[in-house]
Amino acid sequence: IAVEPDSCPSLTRGTYTYDSGDTAGLTPQLMMYTLGRDFIPPIIHAGGLRYHGASPLVSALVHHGLVEAQSVGDEEVYQAASLFLETEGILAAPESSHAIAQTIRAAVVAREEERHEVILFNLSGHGLYDLAFYDRMIPARVARQSVPL
């Protein structure tokens, strides 16, 4: 499953067509899922996923039905990253946290359907350079851990 942010859904809502790989239109045309090179994505926590198109290779896999594409929202990504940090002690990059969110979705479905599955995901980077992403989660964690006086 290829996972992307809801705010930049090239695989799930884009068009499979030739488009430029850059916003200036200087690169060769690439066959990919794209929102159009004129699409200006919002500023999001996962800068590496803030792009108008998807990889031509991943796009071809999705187009031919070999890979499924899903999108996840920011809040679900924050919750998944926080849970992963608290349970596994690993500070995942925001981009990787999209995969973690989708993995949690798949695990919940498997549990509800009483299926035992092996679910793998790619943790492609740490979040040590993305501490601002985690700062957004701290108030929620502190609120959960505080003891009323």
Residue ranges of predicted features:
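Active-site/ligand-binding loops adjacent to catalytic centers
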Residues: 2-90, 94, 136-149
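Short, glycine/acidic-enriched loop or turn micro-motifs at the edges of active sites
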Residues: 7, 98, 128
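Substrate-binding/catalytic subdomain of NAD(P)-dependent oxidoreductase enzymes
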Residues: 91-103
